[in-house]
């Protein structure tokens, strides 16, 4: 199809032509239903263009084809080679490879050294006239500033981009420039001052459109594959919403796509991958040579680009554009791209989202995504439906699962399998339980949604106390005035927002988990990266959990009814018990290990109540010795973890940490084997002889009391293992129990012995693993000039001709579609010495309280205190208490899961569509 244009200044002279079958190779990206390839051709170049053969045209077109039209092939079964380029008029080849290598995303352009993208080359491209080597002089135009200080300029987009828009969306007669111009605004203010009163505005509001859903993608330094995965997934989800046929909401009051805005917030220019900017430029929401470092000496805090595009780039660098009106065609998407001048962390990015853009657009729902998280089909619709069907729902999250690779090949990595199981069980047991109570302790920032009016006010005010750019304004309430405990709390800032939302005075907002919404994210695959990530998670969640427990009294000022408050109190008790068990988990794991070794490895003589047992598995002589060696090895590696955590970075001790995972995994495997032997030995005696059914009292006494082990073991097997299997099968998602659960059983002790030890020993480190940057890029400035007679302030801006815009775009697309080669960077972290004293006190109190519990359970000398003089008796009592407590907590989780599953099934039947 080719759009023939309207007026002479609109789209004339720039066609979009489809390739005939067999002209290229279209490798299909997994999970992507729209496959296309972008090829650029230049018929005006000397000799035969390297792209001429891709067109496959047998005769010249009726009129000249644009030098920079986007031409796509939808022939996935076509051959993988194209004809080799003939020499040019000088008898020399073009220098570009013509092979479409499937491993290269279907684009095999050889790239001259001059186009290799680096930070330096990106900075050079921002200078005026950089694309022409500075030799060409452009005409200029005068741009009036809004209210005398706000610089907002409309720039023509490349012809190929505006030609990609379907004709039915182009309002040429109405004079709309939505698809013809990209809008750039240099925000020289704080996000709180980005208001209509101060002269700032956004396109959707200027077009008088109601924004129902604002989708935010926060970015730090991810590569273009990760961003493309998120961005393309979002556009596919928007297509799902637009294609709804029977919706009573989306199909009234204007097209559905006009009610959705996608906002990308980049945390600083310096750390951003410049290849990602090329991808955004290919879509149409960014251009080189536009950004201004300052406006008349006032520093630009954020560069804001706005455009509505129908183009998308897949993770394997394939350009997708509309070809027909079929259901697979992507609709127009309204984009806001906020490129912050400096790195100021994720909370500040959310302040731009909520306080700047949110207040102008006033959306009903805000959906938060991290770059790299791919929403599954119809997931964003499922999140929105949750709010649409529940007027009191203030926040929600979906299921996040680990990216396992093609055919699940990443599951061969034990760390990936362990994290996959952790995510799955959290989604099956933990989130449904908390959702049943009405308070989900954490809505992951990588995939969650909030009702905008629910978080306005105190929730966002408390949340933004963690923004270091507000530290001078907030004073003692800001991040610089906080103690180390509060600073750690803001490492898990999403937990703070969740608590403040539920506890909002006079309101009855609750939080929910939505099963139908699913998102896929990549997880750390190396030990060092895994440990560093969990340091922030564990410390932040521990501090935030204590914060919510200490401030539970604020719930009484909310508007929740008595039934909801009753369940909040049950959840409070459950959370207190979880915090206590987490605190003493270091001792619990060691005691469990030593008790099981002693039970199996100590020979016993026959008595009236039990038969004789030899030490297992190595005999009476060798087994106690081997068990003692393993216990000492356990303690030795535990001490090593403290030494490593206090003085080394995970990346600097990578092999030692890998050895620690192996040692603890080996000991845990040995314990699992011994546990299996204990179970078999306990059931050597028929269970009917061990448990009495004569009366209720006799059953309770024989099952839970006495010397019989069958009751304790049955409870442990059913609650620790059985409920996981039952819940997973009822959830219709049991596969992780087969391919990931065994890995988790082997490595579960490392969550405490390695991850928590490292986290608590680095309590003083309140960094995100990223540091703020004060480096200002060498970008051009905008200088204000005024006329002699008090004329309005204006800025002179280059008026670049369309041919030069298109020429620049050709190079941009080449860079964008090049495969990304990952460069490993050395992480640098500054340790704050002033926090080490607090860190030391925390670690010592934690270590000594756990050591005291071990001594109390195992020592022989407690006669003076009135305790039993038999340490084996105390060990058995502790072990029974531990198992029963774990069983009770597991039953509570399972009950919440059952309630959630039933409620979800009923709501599916009665919910409004």
From Swiss-Prot:
It is found in: Cell membrane. Residues 1-135 are annotated as: Disordered. It is an enzyme of class 2 (transferase). This is Chitin synthase 1. It comes from the Eukaryota. It comes from Verticillium dahliae (strain VdLs.17 / ATCC MYA-4575 / FGSC 10137). Disruption phenotype: Leads to a winkled surface morphology. Significantly impairs conidiation. Impairs penetration in host plants and exhibits a significant reduced pathogenicity in Arabidopsis and cotton plants. It is a multi-pass membrane protein.
């Amino acid at each position: 199809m080719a759009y023939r244009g309207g007026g002479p200044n609109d789209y004339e002279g720039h066609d979009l032509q489809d390739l005939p079958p067999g002209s290229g190779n279209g490798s299909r990206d997994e999970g992507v239903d729209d496959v296309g390839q972008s090829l650029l051709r230049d018929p005006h170049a000397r000799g035969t263009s390297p792209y001429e053969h891709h067109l496959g045209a047998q005769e010249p077109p009726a009129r000249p084809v644009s030098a920079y039209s986007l031409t796509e092939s939808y022939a996935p079964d076509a051959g993988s080679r194209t004809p080799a380029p003939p020499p040019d008029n000088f008898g020399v080849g073009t220098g570009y490879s013509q092979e479409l290598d499937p491993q290269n995303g279907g684009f095999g352009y050889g790239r001259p050294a001059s186009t290799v993208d680096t930070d330096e080359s990106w900075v050079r491209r921002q200078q005026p006239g950089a694309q022409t080597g500075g030799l060409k002089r452009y005409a200029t135009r005068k741009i009036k500033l809004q209210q005398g200080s706000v610089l907002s300029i409309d720039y023509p987009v490349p012809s190929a981009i505006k030609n990609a828009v379907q004709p039915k969306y182009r309002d040429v007669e109405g004079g709309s420039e939505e698809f013809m111009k990209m809008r750039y605004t240099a925000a020289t203010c704080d996000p709180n001052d980005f208001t209509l009163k101060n002269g700032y505005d956004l396109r959707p509001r200027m077009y008088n459109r109601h924004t129902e859903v604002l989708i935010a993608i926060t970015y730090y330094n991810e590569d273009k594959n990760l961003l493309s995965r998120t961005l393309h997934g979002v556009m596919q989800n928007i297509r799902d919403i637009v294609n709804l046929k029977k919706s009573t909401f989306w199909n009234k009051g204007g097209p559905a796509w006009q009610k959705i805005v996608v906002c990308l917030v980049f945390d600083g220019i310096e750390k951003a991958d410049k290849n990602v900017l090329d991808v955004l430029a290919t879509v149409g929401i960014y251009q080189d040579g536009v950004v201004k470092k300052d406006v008349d000496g006032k520093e630009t805090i954020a560069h804001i680009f706005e455009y509505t595009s129908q183009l998308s780039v897949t993770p394997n660098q394939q350009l997708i554009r509309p070809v027909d009106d079929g259901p697979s065609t992507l609709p127009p998407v309204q984009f806001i791209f906020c490129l912050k001048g400096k790195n100021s962390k994720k909370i500040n990015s959310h302040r731009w989202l909520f306080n700047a853009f949110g207040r102008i657009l006033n959306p009903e729902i805000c959906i938060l995504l991290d770059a790299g998280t791919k929403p599954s089909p119809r997931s964003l619709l499922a999140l929105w439906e949750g709010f649409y069907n529940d007027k009191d729902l203030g926040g929600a999250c979906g299921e996040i699962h680990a990216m396992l690779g093609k055919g699940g090949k990443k599951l061969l990595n034990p760390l990936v399998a362990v994290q996959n199981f952790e995510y799955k069980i959290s989604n099956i047991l933990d989130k449904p339980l908390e959702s049943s109570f009405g308070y989900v302790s954490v809505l992951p920032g990588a995939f969650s949604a909030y009702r905008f009016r629910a978080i306005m006010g105190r929730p966002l005010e408390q949340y933004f106390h963690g923004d270091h750019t507000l530290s001078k304004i907030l004073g003692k309430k800001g991040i610089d005035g906080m103690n180390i405990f509060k600073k750690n709390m803001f490492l898990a800032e999403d937990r703070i927002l969740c608590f403040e939302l539920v506890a909002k005075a006079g309101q009855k907002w609750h939080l929910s988990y939505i099963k139908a919404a699913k998102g896929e994210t990549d997880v750390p695959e190396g030990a060092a990266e895994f440990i560093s990530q969990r340091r922030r998670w564990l410390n932040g969640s521990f501090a935030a959990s204590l914060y919510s427990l200490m401030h539970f009294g604020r719930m009484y000022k909310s508007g929740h009814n008595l039934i909801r408050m009753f369940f909040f109190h049950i959840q409070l008790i459950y959370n207190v018990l979880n915090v206590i068990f987490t605190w003493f988990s270091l001792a619990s794991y060691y005691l469990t290990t030593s008790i099981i070794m002693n039970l199996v490895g100590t020979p016993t003589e026959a008595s009236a109540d039990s038969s004789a047992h030899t030490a297992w598995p190595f005999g009476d002589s060798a087994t106690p010795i081997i068990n003692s060696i393993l216990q000492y090895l356990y303690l030795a590696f535990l001490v090593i973890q403290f030494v490593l955590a206090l003085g080394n970075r995970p990346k600097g001790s990578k092999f030692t940490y890998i050895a620690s995972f192996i040692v603890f995994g080996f000991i845990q495997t040995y314990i699992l084997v011994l546990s299996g032997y204990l179970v078999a030995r306990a059931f050597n005696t028929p269970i009917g002889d061990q448990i009495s059914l004569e009366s209720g009292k006799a059953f309770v006494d024989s099952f839970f009391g006495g010397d019989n082990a069958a009751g304790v073991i049955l409870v442990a097997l059913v609650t620790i293992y059985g409920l996981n299997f039952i819940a997973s099968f009822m959830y219709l998602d049991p596969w992780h129990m087969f391919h990931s659960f065994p890995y988790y059983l082997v490595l579960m002790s490392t969550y405490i012995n390695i991850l928590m030890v490292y986290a608590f020993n680095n309590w003083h480190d309140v960094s995100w693993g990223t540091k703020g940057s004060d480096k200002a890029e060498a970008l051009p400035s905008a200088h204000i000039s005024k006329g002699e007679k008090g004329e309005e302030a204006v800025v002179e801006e280059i008026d670049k001709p369309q041919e030069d815009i298109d020429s620049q775009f050709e190079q941009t697309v080449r860079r964008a579609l090049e495969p990304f080669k990952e460069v490993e960077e050395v992480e640098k972290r500054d340790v704050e010495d002033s926090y080490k004293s607090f860190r030391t006190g925390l670690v010592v109190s934690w270590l000594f309280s756990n050591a005291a519990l071990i001594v109390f359970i195992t020592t022989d000398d407690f006669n003076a205190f009135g305790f039993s003089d038999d340490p084996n008796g105390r060990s058995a009592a502790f072990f029974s208490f531990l198992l029963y407590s774990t069983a009770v907590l597991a039953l509570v989780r399972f009950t919440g899961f059952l309630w959630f599953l039933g409620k979800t099934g009923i709501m599916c039947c009665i919910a409004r569509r």
